[in-house]
Every structure is written in C-alpha cells, then in structure tokens.
C-alpha cells in the first residue's frame, strides 16, 4: 500500500493556486495545467464577457476570474479547463446526499471536486478551498493540497460519509470522462442540476418533459458560462440556489451567513464587484480618514479642558478634594466678611444722616 501511495501524484498548496493543484491532482499529471494556461483561460473569459465591468485601479490585480498574483481562480476557469480536456462537470444536489453517486462507475465518473470552507490563523480567516477526490487503482483518495500526503479511504461507505459530512456547506461537482448523456441522468424528484457541456439543448430533455423535475441547463459557450458564474473567487455557486447572474444577487444566505454572490476566495476575502470601484474606494478611505481626524481633535480638546493634575502629598496620597474644599471655604468666608462690612458701612451712613438731620 505504501508503494502504491508513493506513485500517486500529489501537489501541495501554494498561495491561492488550490484550483491548479486540484486539477493536476485530478489528472495525476504535473503538466496537465500550469499557471500560464489557467491565466490564459481566465483572460479569454474576460475578453468574451459581454458584461464587462468598468476599469478600476484594482483591475491590474483583481481580475474578474482570477488574481494575477496569487491565483484565486473561480469556477468558470475550472469548467472551461475541464471542457478543454473533454470532461464535463455536473453539480450535485446536496438534498439527495452522496448515496445517489455511483462510485463504482469508473468508466464515466473521473473524480469529485468539492469547494469546502476552511479556517486559518486560529479561525480569524475564513475562506474557501478546492478539494478533489479520485479513485486510483481501485482505491479512493482525498487529494487535498492542504494534506501532507493523500488520504486513503478504506471503502465506498467512508467516501460517502466524507461527502455527506461536507454536503451541508460544500459545492460538489462530479467530473465525467465523457459528455454527459441525457439517458444517464439520475431521475429524482426536485432534482436541480447544472450542465455546462452540451451546445444542443432543444431536444436534450424531450423524453423527460412529462417528468416532474426541475432542471437548469446551460450551454457550452464560454461567454454564457462566464455570465452564469459571474463572480470573483473560488466559490460562486451555492447548492441551495441558482448560479449568481450579473446584476442579480440571490437573497439566500450561503455558508457563514454570507450571500452566495459575495466574493469569498480560497484564501482571501475580496470586496464585491459592486464595491470594487475607484469612486467607492476613495469615498470609503476619505470617510475613515475624517473619522480618525475627528477622533484626534476630540481627544486634544478633552486634554485642554481637563484641569492639571494635583501633586501628591509627602505621604504619597493626593488630596485634591481637601484642597478644593479649603479654597471654597476661604472664598466663602471672604465674601461673607465683605457683605458684613458693607452692611455695617451702610448702617453707619444712615445713622450719621439721621443725627445730622436732628441737629439741624
């Protein structure tokens, strides 16, 4: 078993290139995809996007489908890359569970991709991460790039347990070796599946028109795929909702009570596209600067208004209250004496006037 594990190709995590590692681990080939090839796919998706966004200073780094420095490729890049290899992606409905996945169908099912939530730096950093599970030489392995070595599953039940454990928060895609045939669709009530491989959609579900299903089908067109999964980051699709479309955010909350359209990435929380404008960025920075300036001014005013500190006595205990009381008593006694003198002087003045009048 150790010899078989040593022959398994497994790439380790580097920056935010988890999708690159995921695809190479899936194909068991270090040259299956490169950083340059994925960047080229992301740039083509941006070029063919009919709903291009306005240019911002952050556009040099934060591209619509990837980050030029750290990677952070989104789901559009994954779908396009797999379709270029003749594979198709089908999103699995978490309400059905992993029991509906035929893990023994080695001729059709190539692997399973998950987009899982991860916590880093003691839970201070929450992000998303691409993980791939594949069957190699009759044994299922977890080829997560965060693992030191591939994790072996003892049997299919353990694989399904792993998938069911993550289904509540994860986005799971089934990677098929061949174009997905409509005759192979697992018919189940209220099943919602996203298919991104076929270009002929008119007669695809003609034989199941009377079946009470809810299918969302999307064609194999890069621009439309880009329009469907229009968001930056690794996770832009929630199993509870439809894919996020341009200009329309879903009101259903995703993992960690975030909107499924938010730009959560595999290692970085980026601002939403609606927030990623130069005017909004300058406005936010100016507001923060003004708030900080006001805080500094208020503190300086408080320092000027505050009385000087009283010196401590020889015993080491300050007596501000005693000093203030003594000063107040002195002022009061002086005022009382002035009043008494004034009354005495006024009374003596009236008396002198009365005596002078009697003499006259």
Curated annotation (Swiss-Prot):
What reaction(s) does this enzyme catalyze?
Thiol-dependent hydrolysis of ester, thioester, amide, peptide and isopeptide bonds formed by the C-terminal Gly of ubiquitin (a 76-residue protein attached to proteins as an intracellular targeting signal)
- The EC class name is hydrolase
Query: Phosphoprotein: present as a keyword of the record?
Result: no
Q: Where in the sequence is the active site?
A: 18, 129
Sorted alphabetically, the keyword list is: Hydrolase, Nucleotide-binding, Protease, Ubl conjugation pathway
Question: Is the keyword Glycosyltransferase assigned to this protein?
Answer: no
Single Gene Ontology MF annotation: nucleotide binding
Tell me the domain of life. Answer: Eukaryota
Residue ranges occupied by any Josephin domain in the UniProt entry: 5-192
- Its Enzyme Commission number(s) read 3.4.19.12
Q: What does this protein do?
A: May act as a deubiquitinating enzyme.
The name this protein carries in UniProt is Josephin-like protein
Which species is the source of this protein?
Answer: Arabidopsis thaliana
